[in-house]
């Protein structure tokens, strides 16, 4: 029997000694969704962030008390502080809470508390978490299960990255970047892949990262389910260590659920799903690339295990409207002689960038790819430097913005000027270094040709570039057409 909203709220209200929940950095992608769910559950929520944004405005419209800037008095009425890994103990709000002996909990611990009374489905992996979580939420909704979800990106169909549902299901991303996913105790866990990223958390020890994923899977109850992508060599390596029921997925013949006959036509990808003891399923997703086929397979594995019928699976996947900044097509820039397809993508690891480039080549093989890329973090650029040089060389035209620091100090030789020099030395193309974001539009104008695909790629403030270009008069735009997030 599906529990009513009141029944679920009554259970969650076992946090009965907690009145006001205060989020430090409430505008962050991982924080705002949890705050929104708690608001919808009837909690008093406040939060602070360094600057106002559409996210903080949305939360304020739901009743959250928002403070701009971090000050000790912001946490005066809090019964618990929720912090992300980016917030340290020197934050004045955290210092005040510690002095007053108010609990300070990581974001994942609050998510775990929400998951405690629900059937939790947690999606982990270095790449593909947001899209896979979104696909699962879409299929569960199509199956009439009305899940609660907390996602790291905006689900376009819902217009939000979090939603309180009326069923027992909670679908959420599980973040390995700070190992905080170990707080979660889901019923079902997905691991999409395991790659060398955020290695500072694991003291540069890849074996420690692998062990942490195994520990995460062992947070499942003995009757839980691990859904694992065996196309990934590291996931395949840890599979014998996982002492829980498993379903595997991938393209290889040994996967429990696999895809064959994959073909791409522009944005849409078609494939056939082969499942053990079930009829083949003809499927399509409105997303390009083999990596998204794998994300869909994880979704199908869980949906089948939960008893969702094939009609709902097909409907939820084929009608999926995408996630913000995951190969998001903004439309066309107008230049002399025709249009240029404008795409925005969040991927910032070499493997993610390579998957996007492969998707572009697969869906539009006869079109030039013009890429504006912003590296994210100096440490990532340093650690994966040669991979970036090789993969970025596959664009036809490349503009490189300076590294988005994300709080890090510059590292000599791990900056975009160095990347430009190294890419130029390979001889495939001559990249252009862009010192200021405001210079991008006039630099692009003479470079673009009708029919090009313009890809804005990265996780930093490049996220504001696509809407800025779309409304730029240089490309036939109107300044009022799209809300702009300014670039420096």
UniProtKB/Swiss-Prot annotation:
Principal location listed in the UniProt entry: cytoplasm
InterPro entries for the chain: Mur-like_cat_sf, Mur_ligase_C, Mur_ligase_C_dom_sf, Mur_ligase_cen, Mur_ligase_N, MurCDEF_pg_biosynth, UDP-N-AcMur_Ala_ligase_MurC
A single GO molecular function term of this UniProt record: ATP binding
Pathway: Cell wall biogenesis; peptidoglycan biosynthesis
Gene Ontology cellular component terms for the protein in this record: cytoplasm
Cellular compartments annotated: Cytoplasm
UniProt record similarity statement: Belongs to the MurCDEF family.
HAMAP family, per database record: MurC
Top enzyme class: ligase
UniProt protein name: UDP-N-acetylmuramate--L-alanine ligase
Functional description taken from the UniProt entry: Cell wall formation.
Catalysed reaction, written as an equation: UDP-N-acetyl-alpha-D-muramate + L-alanine + ATP = UDP-N-acetyl-alpha-D-muramoyl-L-alanine + ADP + phosphate + H(+)
Alphabetical GO biological process terms: cell division; cell wall organization; peptidoglycan biosynthetic process; regulation of cell shape
């Amino acid at each position: 029997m599906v529990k009513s909203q009141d029944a679920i709220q009554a259970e969650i209200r076992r946090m009965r000694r907690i009145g006001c929940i205060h989020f430090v950095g409430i505008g962050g992608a991982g924080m705002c969704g949890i705050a929104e769910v708690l608001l919808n559950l009837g909690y008093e929520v406040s939060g602070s962030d360094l600057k106002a944004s559409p996210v903080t405005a949305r939360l304020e419209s739901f009743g959250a008390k928002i403070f701009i800037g971090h000050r000790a008095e912001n946490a005066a009425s809090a019964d618990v502080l929720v912090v992300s890994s980016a917030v340290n103990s020197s934050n004045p709000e955290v210092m005040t809470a510690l002095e007053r002996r108010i609990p300070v909990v990581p974001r994942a611990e609050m998510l775990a508390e929400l998951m405690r009374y629900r059937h939790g489905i947690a999606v982990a992996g270095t790449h593909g978490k947001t899209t896979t979580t979104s696909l699962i939420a879409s299929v569960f909704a199509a199956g009439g299960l009305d899940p609660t979800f907390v996602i790291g990106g905006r689900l376009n169909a819902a217009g939000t990255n979090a939603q309180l549902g009326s069923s027992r299901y909670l679908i959420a991303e599980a973040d390995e970047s700070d190992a905080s996913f170990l707080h979660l105790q889901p019923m079902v866990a997905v691991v999409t892949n395991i790659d060398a990223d955020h290695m500072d958390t694991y003291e540069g020890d890849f074996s420690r990262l692998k062990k942490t994923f195994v520990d995460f899977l062992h947070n499942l109850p003995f009757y839980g389910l691990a859904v694992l992508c065996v196309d990934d060599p590291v996931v395949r390596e840890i599979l014998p260590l996982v002492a829980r029921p498993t379903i595997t997925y991938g393209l290889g013949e040994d996967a429990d659920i696999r895809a064959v006959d994959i073909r791409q036509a522009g944005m849409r990808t078609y494939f056939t799903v082969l499942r053990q003891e079930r009829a083949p399923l003809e499927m399509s997703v409105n997303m390009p690339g083999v990596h998204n086929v794998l994300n869909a397979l994880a979704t199908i594995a869980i949906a089948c295990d939960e008893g969702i019928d094939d009609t709902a699976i097909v409907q939820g996947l084929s009608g999926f409207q995408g996630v913000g900044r995951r190969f998001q097509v903004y439309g066309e820039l107008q230049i002399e002689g025709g249009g240029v397809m404008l795409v925005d993508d969040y991927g910032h690891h070499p493997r993610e960038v390579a998957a996007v480039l492969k998707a572009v080549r697969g869906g539009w093989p006869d079109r030039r790819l013009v890429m504006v890329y912003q590296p994210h973090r100096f440490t990532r650029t340093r650690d994966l430097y040669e991979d970036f040089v090789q993969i970025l060389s596959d664009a036809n035209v490349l503009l490189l913005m300076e590294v988005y620091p994300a709080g890090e100090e510059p590292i000599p030789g791990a900056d975009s000027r160095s990347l430009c020099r190294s890419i130029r030395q390979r001889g495939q193309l001559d990249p252009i270094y862009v010192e200021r974001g405001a210079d991008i539009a006039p630099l692009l104008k003479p470079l673009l040709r009708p029919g090009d695909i313009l890809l804005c790629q990265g996780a930093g403030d490049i996220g504001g570039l696509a809407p800025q270009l779309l409304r730029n008069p240089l490309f036939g735009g109107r300044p009022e057409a799209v809300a702009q997030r300014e670039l420096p």
